């Protein structure tokens, strides 16, 4: 059985990766009514007998057991692609990861810009608040100084007049005793001075008294 299979494969032609395509006869009535795409699809179908024989040969060489499995069309397509008989595979679309990378970079840049802008605004607000606090303190100090100056100007005459009156009024018994002692001492000193002047300079005192009397009566 294996020898017959090998002979059949040699008859088909050694070195072919996929079954040969049937040639189209120009006078074939069946092929005239079918479109070209349909004929090409039929010509690209793998030969089941060839797949079966190839699988048989592989099992004999490898000593596999169990039922034989027919080759998948994917393997046949791969062999066709390697041999250059089949159509070229279409280019794979770009993965979503490669498309998202620029978007993620743009999002990161935008977030960094927003963070820097918010940080700048926060610092600006802090500086403005500090400036406002300092200006309020200076304004309060100036207002306090102005009020104190006004109070001092208003209280200066009152303190002089009221202070003198309060000083002359005795506040307690000791102040009253002090005032009496000073008054008596002033009277005693004045009397002694008058007696001394009349005793030593009586002529001068008499002349002064006469001048005062003449001036008083003359006026």
UniProtKB/Swiss-Prot annotation:
Residue ranges of the region described as Disordered: 1-101
GO CC, any one term: membrane
Biased composition annotated in UniProt, kind: Basic and acidic residues: 1-10, 29-45
Subcellular location, record wording: Membrane
Membrane protein topology class: Multi-pass membrane protein
Membrane listed as a keyword: yes
Matching InterPro entries: TMEM247 (IPR029200)
Ranges in coiled-coil conformation: 121-156
Cross-referenced Pfam families: TMEM247
Keyword list, A-Z: Coiled coil, Membrane, Transmembrane, Transmembrane helix
Keyword check for Transferase: no
Predominant location: membrane
Residues passing through the membrane, by range: 167-187, 194-214
Protein name, per record: Transmembrane protein 247
Native source species: Homo sapiens
């Amino acid at each position: 059985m294996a020898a017959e299979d090998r002979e059949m494969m040699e008859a088909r032609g050694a070195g072919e990766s996929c079954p040969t395509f049937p040639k189209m006869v120009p006078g074939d009535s069946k092929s005239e009514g079918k479109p070209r795409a349909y004929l090409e699809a039929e010509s690209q179908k793998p030969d089941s007998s060839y797949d079966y024989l190839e699988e048989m040969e592989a099992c004999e060489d490898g000593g596999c057991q169990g039922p034989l499995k027919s080759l998948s069309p994917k393997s046949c397509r791969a062999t066709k692609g390697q041999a250059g008989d089949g159509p070229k595979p279409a280019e794979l679309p770009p993965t979503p990861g490669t498309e998202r990378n620029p978007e993620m970079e743009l999002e990161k840049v935008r977030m960094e810009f927003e963070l820097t802008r918010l940080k700048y605004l926060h610092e600006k607000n802090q500086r403005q608040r500090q400036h406002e606090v300092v200006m309020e303190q200076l304004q309060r100090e100036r207002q306090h100084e102005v009020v104190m100056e006004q109070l001092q100007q208003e209280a200066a005459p009152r303190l002089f007049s009221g202070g003198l009156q309060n000083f002359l009024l005795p506040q307690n018994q000791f102040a009253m005793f002090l005032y009496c002692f000073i008054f008596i001492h002033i009277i005693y000193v004045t009397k002694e001075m008058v007696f001394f002047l009349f005793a030593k300079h009586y002529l001068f005192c008499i002349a002064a008294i006469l001048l005062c009397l003449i001036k008083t009566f003359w006026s």
